[in-house]
Curated annotation (Swiss-Prot):
Entry cofactors: pyridoxal 5'-phosphate
Residues bearing PTM N6-(pyridoxal phosphate)lysine: K75
GO biological process: lysine biosynthetic process via diaminopimelate
InterPro entries: Ala_racemase/Decarboxylase_C (IPR009006), De-COase2_N (IPR022644), Orn/DAP/Arg_de-COase (IPR000183), PLP-binding_barrel (IPR029066), Y4yA-like (IPR042152)
GO molecular function: diaminopimelate decarboxylase activity
Highest rank taxon of the organism: Bacteria
Pfam families: Orn_Arg_deC_N
Protein name: Uncharacterized protein y4yA
Keywords for this protein: Plasmid, Pyridoxal phosphate
């Protein structure tokens, strides 16, 4: 494999899990065989990576003897293999659509392992959640009324959380302000078919400080609910645990050195995901629990004293290092004396950050199909998909390849399991949907593919 950089000294090589690095360095011919058989782009998934990530988070919580509930945010990708890995490792699933719920049920999840989030649940979604007694996060007073209306007269108690919209999130359409939470509690006071289990929030961004502030607001509402005669036992902090895609120092150097001319658009994107996070998800969670909550108590101390379960729905954080996306190069086209465009078999719908006016700030890895007989000059290029859309660009960054790519070579993007590999995938131009497989090692440690479908995983 060949790593490259955008500017000498300011490249962004991805952090690679050993299994991924071994596939690229030791089993290159196997990778080409898989691409030949299954097409490009090809999404490869490692369920054991999710289990490792889950164990790291659970370790932080069990070390503090905190009651907890971790639900894998299934919306992060479409992999049943990762959903099954979460279930087999003791986690639950966060389902945000009727179809995610049905997949979870087909994988064997009962209602006790499911939480349903999202603001726009349909009556059909509500009904199937009620039928399996899944935990439902209620987004608004309007949703609460719809839910109550849909409950059978002889229904057992339906467990719910009320979704809080913290004060500093006033422009968000998700959740409800504290006074609306209290209004919902008053509505529930005479409704025996619904059990109020606690509060839920999910914030944009990755700052611990905003979570602590939201926890303080939630604590006040937990106290108010108990004064009203309820027995809440959970605070759910949603997701947003950061992960590390690239080395922090390299990332800072890259951001400091980038200039508008480094992009084919002549413009630096306004924002990026924090690819060079200083903390792993487990470290971030550790620091959140140690943060001061109130009256000199830490978050962990507050939860323990109040007898509260800490729930969360990590998506990206559990899918960290769990997938790669493999593109095959179809053509390298010269645009001028020192610039090229590299066309791949596939589209930016399978590496979709440019559709959000940003960039996936991880350098792709070039895996040559054959060894060049002569040393080819470096190539400066951006990456484009195979569609007729001018916007179908995988990377607007000018990338400098010290070894010139050729048709038939592979470009591998690492760590695409979180809202990247299949978030926008489709059959544009009637191309088939990209294939997705789980990578499982045999007894000799050799990687093998298993279809990433329900019934196979």
């Amino acid at each position: 494999m060949t790593l490259h950089c955008q500017k000498i000294g300011h490249g962004l090589p991805p952090i690679l899990r050993s299994a991924t690095a071994d596939l690229l360095t030791k089993y290159g011919p196997l990778l080409f065989d898989w691409a030949a058989r299954h097409g490009s782009p090809l999404n490869l998934v490692w369920p054991d990576a999710l289990r490792e990530n889950l164990a790291a988070l659970k370790g932080v919580l069990t070390e503090r003897r905190l009651e907890h509930a971790i639900y894998y945010g299934a919306k992060a990708n479409k992999s049943p293999g990762l959903m099954q890995a979460a279930l087999s490792a003791g986690a639950g699933l966060d389902v945000s659509s009727l179809y995610e719920l049905r997949d979870a049920r087909r994988l064997g999840a009962d209602g006790a392992r499911l939480v349903a989030t999202g603001p726009a649940k349909t009556s059909a979604f509500h009904q199937e959640l009620i039928n399996c007694n899944a935990l439902i996060s209620v987004d608004s007073p309007e949703e609460l009324e719809d839910l109550i209306h849909g409950l059978p007269a002889d229904a057992g108690q339906q467990s719910i959380l009320l979704r809080l919209r913290p004060r500093d999130q006033s422009k968000s359409r998700f959740g409800m302000p504290p006074d609306a939470v209290v209004h919902c509690l008053a509505r529930l006071a005479g409704e025996g078919r619904v059990r109020f289990d606690g509060l839920h929030f999910h914030l944009s961004g990755y700052r611990r400080e905003t979570r602590v502030a939201a926890l303080r607001e939630a604590a006040d509402l937990i106290a108010e609910a108990r004064r009203m005669g309820f027995f809440p036992g959970m605070i759910d902090i949603g997701g947003g645990l950061p992960i590390q895609y690239v080395d922090r120092a390299r990332y800072k150097a890259h951001l400091a050195a980038q200039a508008p001319e480094d992009y084919r658009t002549g413009k630096i994107p306004d924002s990026f995901y924090p690819y060079g996070s200083t903390l792993s998800a487990a470290d971030w969670l550790h620091r959140l629990l140690e943060a001061e909550m109130n009256q000199g108590r830490s978050v962990a101390g507050y939860l323990a004293r109040e007898g509260l379960t800490l729930a969360m729905e990590p998506g990206r954080a559990l899918a960290d290092q769990a997938a790669i996306t493999v593109f095959r190069i179809s053509r390298v086209k010269a645009l001028g004396p020192d610039s090229h465009v590299i066309f791949v078999e596939g589209s930016s719908f399978s590496a979709c950050e440019t559709w959000f006016a940003s960039e996936f700030l991880i350098d792709p890895i070039l895996v040559p199909a054959t060894k060049a007989t002569v040393q080819l000059p470096p190539v400066r290029a951006y990456l484009a998909g195979h569609s007729c859309l001018d916007e179908d660009v995988i990377s607007n960054r000018w990338l400098t390849f010290p070894t010139a790519p050729r048709a038939g070579d592979l470009l591998v993007y690492a760590n695409t399991g979180g809202y990247q590999m299949d978030l926008l995938e489709n059959e544009f131009h009637r191309h088939p949907m990209p294939a997705r497989f789980c990578v499982i090692e045999d007894a000799e440690g050799r990687p093998n593919l298993v279809p990433d479908t329900i019934g196979e995983v």
